[in-house]
Amino acid sequence: MMARRDPTSWAKRLVRAQTLQKQRRAPVGPRAPPPDEEDPRLKCKNCGAFGHTARSTRCPMKCWKAALVPATLGKKEGKENLKPWKPRGEANPGPLNKDKGEKEERPRQQDPQRKALLHMFSGKPPEKPLPNGKGSTESSDYLRVASGPMPVHTTSKRPRLDPVLADRSATEMSGRGSVLASLSPLRKASLSSSSSLGPKERQTGAAADMPQPAVRHQGREPLLVVKPTHSRPEGGCREVPQAASKTHGLLQASRPQAQDKRPAVTPQPCPPAATHSLGLGSNLSFGPGAKRPAQAPIQACLNFPKKPRLGPFQIPESAIQGGELGAPENLQPPPAATELGPSTSPQMGRRTPAQVPSVDRQPPHSRPCLPTAQACTMSHHSAAGHDGAQPLRVLFRRLENGRWSSSLLAAPSFHSPEKPGAFLAQSPHVSEKSEAPCVRVPPSVLYEDLQVSSSSEDSDSDLE
């Protein structure tokens, strides 16, 4: 029976058994980790990762071959300047330097042409070259050469004469007279007197169309411009544009001594002119003194201000004519004005204290701006005992709410300039005929408005 057993067969069986054991140990697919290594609550002490322990073969610290080495993303040849350029010399200029050189040569070639044109227009001789042979190479040199004298800026400038007065001879300009108008001395201003009118305008008696410019002073106050003349009394109306100041009333000026021995002159209207503020009472001096005084009367005209807020009330184009400026006071009205009602006396009584001459005080600002004021001048022929004729002026003012008030104003005598209150109210004779009516509103409308507004003015005086 022992001979029947083959040793080769036994060896084959042993090999088969060993192969089967190897196949059982080595799995066909990936080996699943044991359940203890998959616990996320575990933490490796070597790498600090969760899911395995330090003894596990999954730890990258134990198997470095399995760890991936970080590879570079790429070379930075375009960003890094591995081969910097060398600075190019003038012998081998680059394309940018060539363009700059061409641009610099062009203006240098144009400099001689520009200088030639500059000398042609300015009329100056050409500049001599420098001894070292180096001229100005800047392209903006032609802008620095002045073609004419630089303007000189001064603070005080003389007023420009009108084109009509520009062709006057030197004799007429030297014969200009100076006129001093003495008013309430609230403020003082000095104005330059304008030239006399042309011979044609003297014959017609028309005022100059273009008003003379005057020096502008501080504040919004009226401006007074007086034009002396050496012609006969029929000369044109002198322009005295002036807006009423903050106190209510009108201004009067004293006449020259030459007028006291002459008859009354018919007043003529004056065109409106631009006005600037000076004040109610100011001492005005005009121009340089002449060899002889003015032989013609100075006729004042109060004209329209440019804006209503420049003065307490507006003055229409038809202004007061035939009289001069001065300090107004109350006068007893003539028989033609006695029917106007009691509204005139309290109003003028309130305004007279504000017009007392004072140097340091300013006009009060109590009353609001009144809309309009219209004045009329009537010839006042004095009786025996008065040398000259003095005009009598009636002032109509339009108050608030369409009310009207009237007042009588007369020019003072020239013999007593220190007393502005000396009026010609002593003369009982007053002509009833108005030589130069200035009021455009019918008298009946004024009388009705004054009679209706008498009670309202009394209430205003009580409130003030």
Swiss-Prot record:
Under the heading InterPro entries, the entry gives: FAM90 (IPR039213), Znf-CCHC_6 (IPR041670)
Entry-linked Pfam families? zf-CCHC_6
Q: Where is this region: Disordered?
A: 1-42, 69-389, 415-437
Composition-biased stretches, type Basic and acidic residues, lie in: 74-89, 97-114
Bias category Low complexity: which stretches?
Answer: 180-197
Superkingdom as given in the UniProt entry: Eukaryota
Miscellaneous note, as given in the UniProt record, is: Primate-specific FAM90A gene family, thought to have arisen during multiple duplication and rearrangement events.
Belongs to which family? Belongs to the FAM90 family.
Stated name of the protein:
Protein FAM90A24
Record organism: Homo sapiens (Human)
